[in-house]
């Protein structure tokens, strides 16, 4: 950008007075040397000069400053504004959706990274080991999901089971059985805080619903065989995916249905919510 015609230069200081002749001399001796390199060398040489050697240049700078003040009494130094720093190339100038930044940087998704940090901490599973072993990554992700759906004690057991099962070649198969055990223990444990607000008959049904869903998902991912659905024991409107055989085993309770006729009393154990029975 060209300077205006009425631009007034600053008065030279002692270093500028000394380096004016030295710069010209050094540029003639080294025609290929860049101006910035010349300035560095001149600055180093100026610092090596003694006070007696600098004194004539200091006096000359004072004389030039006094002359400058007489010629331009209204002069005021106005430094140039520095240009605003541009955004870095590796930063996004717009909001990035969740997980997109990791894909752009060739990193694992944040969900897998969080599962590696939290779920694998108990069993000594680091992020590097999870990236190199898909089975350990799946076990850590299942343990992270268990902390969301199960109570605290069951979540700790799920994390321990996932860490223990991650070392063997059949880790996913073992994880399915471990999740089934955890689901049964969580259904008999403490009640979930949101079970009653959703109209479930008790905390056991809600815990069994979440436990069966997690166990079925883990088993289906491991085996990949025949899958079908069972009615939820807590709410018959929901179907739980299952990976067991086509015929239910003796341990599974078959779905029950009650027909209410006039004159008949309500059964003592009602597995369905009152609203669903009224709809029948």
Swiss-Prot record:
Q: Which GO terms describe its cellular component?
A: nucleus
Name the GO terms of the biological process aspect: brain development; inner ear development; inner ear morphogenesis; negative regulation of DNA-templated transcription; negative regulation of transcription by RNA polymerase II; neuron differentiation; positive regulation of transcription by RNA polymerase II; regulation of cell differentiation
Molecular function terms, GO-annotated: DNA-binding transcription activator activity, RNA polymerase II-specific; RNA polymerase II cis-regulatory region sequence-specific DNA binding; sequence-specific DNA binding
Where does this protein bind DNA? 8-76
Where is it localised? Nucleus
Q: Look up keyword Glycoprotein and say if it applies.
A: no
PROSITE patterns listed in its UniProt record: HMG_BOX_2
The record ties this protein, via InterPro entries, to: HMG_box_dom, HMG_box_dom_sf, SOX_fam, SRY-related_HMG-box_TF-like
Which SMART domains does the record associate with it? HMG
Keyword list (alphabetical) reads: DNA-binding, Nucleus, Repressor, Transcription, Transcription regulation
Q: Which tissues does it occur in?
A: Expressed predominantly in CNS.
Where is it mostly found? Answer: nucleus
Physiological role: Acts as a negative regulator of transcription.
* Name this polypeptide is given: Transcription factor SOX-21
Taxonomic source organism: Gallus gallus (Chicken)
Gene (name only):
SOX21
């Amino acid at each position: 950008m060209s300077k205006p015609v009425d631009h007034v230069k600053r008065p030279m200081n002692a270093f500028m007075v000394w380096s004016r002749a030295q710069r010209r001399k050094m540029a003639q001796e080294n025609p290929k040397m860049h101006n910035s390199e010349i300035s560095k060398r001149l600055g180093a040489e100026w610092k090596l000069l003694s006070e007696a050697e600098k004194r004539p240049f200091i006096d000359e700078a004072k004389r030039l400053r006094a002359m400058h003040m007489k010629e331009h009494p209204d002069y005021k130094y106005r430094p140039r504004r520095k240009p605003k720093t541009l955004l870095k190339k590796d930063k996004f100038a717009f909001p990035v959706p969740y997980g997109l930044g990791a894909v752009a940087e060739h990193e694992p998704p944040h969900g897998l990274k969080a599962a590696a940090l939290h779920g694998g901490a108990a069993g000594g599973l680091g992020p590097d080991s999870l990236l190199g072993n898909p089975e350990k990554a799946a076990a850590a992700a299942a343990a992270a999901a268990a902390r969301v759906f199960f109570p605290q004690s069951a979540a700790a057991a799920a994390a321990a089971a996932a860490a223990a099962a991650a070392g063997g070649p059949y880790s996913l198969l073992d994880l399915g059985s471990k999740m089934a055990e955890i689901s049964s223990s969580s259904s008999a444990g403490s009640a979930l805080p949101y079970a009653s607000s959703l109209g479930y008959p008790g905390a056991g049904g809600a815990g069994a619903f979440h436990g069966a869903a997690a166990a079925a998902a883990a088993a289906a991912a491991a085996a990949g065989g025949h899958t079908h659905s069972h009615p939820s024991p807590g709410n018959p409107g929901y179907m739980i995916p299952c990976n067991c055989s086509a015929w239910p085993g003796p341990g599974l309770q078959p779905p029950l249905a009650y027909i209410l006729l006039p004159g008949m009393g309500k059964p003592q154990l009602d597995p369905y919510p009152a609203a669903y029975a009224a709809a029948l």
